[in-house]
Design a protein with these regions (language model features):
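Conserved beta-strand-loop surface patch within small alpha/beta domains used
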Residues: 1-63, 71-109
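Generic beta-sheet signal
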Residues: 92-94, 209, 233
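Second-shell loop/turn segments in exported
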Residues: 116-122
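Active-site nucleophilic cysteine motif
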Residues: 122-139
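Short acidic alpha-helical/loop segments enriched in Asp/Glu that coordinate divalent cations
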Residues: 141-153
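...with weaker cross-activation on analogous glycine-rich loops/strands in unrelated enzymes
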Residues: 150-216, 220-221
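Glycine- and charge-enriched low-complexity intrinsically disordered segments
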Residues: 218-236
Length: 236
């Protein structure tokens, strides 16, 4: 989502002002204008927009996006993901580091799919499962289920990328000999559960996105020892 320069300037100013007093900023974009909202959350590193502020613009179908700031990262929290899904409009995160905005990231299924190769890793949006979802949306016009999650969920007892969850999303297990372009491969990389997914793109290569790296295509044999299973989409 591309903001007008004047709108982006207002968002940046608000985020930096709130960061200076240890708060997250929050606001809404309406008719290409940024409107500041009061953060009524009592918790640090959290935000909440009052029901009245939200409803005033939502009822007229003029609300384009909800924006809030994070201190020192872009990564989506589980609450961010739940909130965006519930509102069905794009959300944006403003990353403030040492008092200065370092960038903005918008996400949501209504936005165009970004390039699949060379994207920055942002947990909850541009991560391994986000890449699988975007591949299926772009290449097959299929909308896969979203799973709200916290960062490093696998180290806290989570099992997001389980075979059961993929089955619920419309996949079934196949043998490696049946592997075709577009099939999904699940991995367990230095974890007790499946914590990575990739798409097979043919010629012995996968498309995937690891933490702290850009999304890329790589030979599958590099990751052979981490493979747990192969999955094919059949529809929900």
């Amino acid at each position: 989502m591309k903001l007008k320069q004047s709108v982006e300037k207002e968002v940046r100013k608000h985020a930096e002002e709130e960061h200076a007093i240890g708060r997250e900023c929050c606001g809404i974009i309406v008719k290409d204008k940024y409107i500041r909202c009061e953060n009524i959350s009592e918790e640090e590193n959290s935000f909440e927009i009052s029901v009245n502020d939200y409803a005033k613009y939502m009822k007229n179908d003029t609300l384009q996006a909800i924006v809030h700031s994070h201190n020192n990262d872009f990564h989506l929290s589980k609450e961010d993901m739940v909130g965006q899904i519930k509102t069905s409009i794009p959300w944006g995160i403003v990353n403030v580091v040492s008092g200065t905005v370092r960038g903005m990231h918008f996400w949501g299924d209504s936005l165009p799919v970004k390039d699949l190769i060379g994207r920055e890793f942002i947990h909850g949006s541009q991560d391994c499962y986000g890449l699988v979802r975007d591949y299926y949306k772009k290449e097959k016009d299929i909308k896969l289920k979203q799973y709200p999650r916290d960062n490093y969920w696998w180290s806290n007892g989570g099992d997001l990328l389980s075979e059961e969850n993929f089955k619920e999303t419309g996949f079934y297990k196949i043998d490696s000999s049946e592997l075709e372009v577009g099939d999904v491969i699940l991995f367990s990389i230095r974890a007790n559960v499946v914590n990575h997914s990739a798409i097979y793109i043919g010629n012995g290569e996968v498309l995937h996105h690891l933490s702290k790296r850009l999304s890329r295509r790589e030979p599958i044999h590099i990751w052979n020892k981490y493979i747990v299973c192969f999955l094919k989409y059949k529809g929900e």
